[in-house]
Amino acid sequence: MEYSDQALILAVKRFREIDAWVRLLSPTRGVYTAFAFGGLKSRRRFLGCLDPLNHVQFKVRRSGYRGYHCLAEGKLLDAPRQLRSHPQRLGMAVNCLKFFEAAPVAPGSFAQAYGLMRAMLSTLDAADEPSPLFPLLFRARMTFLHGMLPACGQCAVCGQPLGHDGAVCHVEEGRVACPDCRAAASGGVHARLGGEALALLASAVEQGPEQWAACRPHPAAGREFSRAVDLLVRYHMGLAWEQGGFVRA
């Protein structure tokens, strides 16, 4: 079986002298691994293709009784122009990539995840000074794709719109309530969200990476937003950032 697939390269690893395995993200197949036999030597079949973060059109064959994916050839569609030479921006991209790989999406979200990853890389490649909150906004959006980020437009208890008065995020319940309804909610871990932090949560869901790069909230609002997202990710997805990577919490 042979097919053509556009994919984003997440990782490339050598497993023999001239052979590599390649981790790919496809809008139709999600994340999968393929072998590029001779890929580290061939200039004709994979010219300029096999680098992480490249966007490539591959011809793929499935072979063997286990249905291994083998890359027959590739055509480079686009690649970051500046990202790899800017450590701060590259660090943000790697942070986003590590979270994405730690929390695989369901088949119904493959196309959304692919589009989000492409937009993330494109934005970080072009933005001179992206917001320090950019990776956290990406994390919140991914949590939303998993169905684990609470709606933030109205109180989950009384239904009233949430606004400048802020809100309270009830972590275990995965919902946001207005301050007046906090007493009516069950116990557990609560994270306060002021009006600006609540707006950041809305931005993570309703806007995209290009808008996130320009976010410059008050530091206190950034801390509130950061704490709420970290608590939600830890409780509902079982992930925490430790020593340069995401681990099971």
Curated annotation (Swiss-Prot):
Cellular component aspect of the GO annotation: bacterial nucleoid
BP GO terms, sorted: DNA recombination; double-strand break repair
Signal peptide stretch: none
InterPro entries recorded: ARFGAP/RecO, DNA_rep/recomb_RecO_N, NA-bd_OB-fold, RecO, RecO_C
SUPFAM superfamilies to which the protein is assigned, alphabetical: ArfGap/RecO-like zinc finger (SSF57863), Nucleic acid-binding proteins (SSF50249)
Family stated for the protein in its record: Belongs to the RecO family.
Official protein name in the record: DNA repair protein RecO
Species this protein is from: Solidesulfovibrio magneticus (strain ATCC 700980 / DSM 13731 / RS-1)
Gene this chain is encoded by: recO
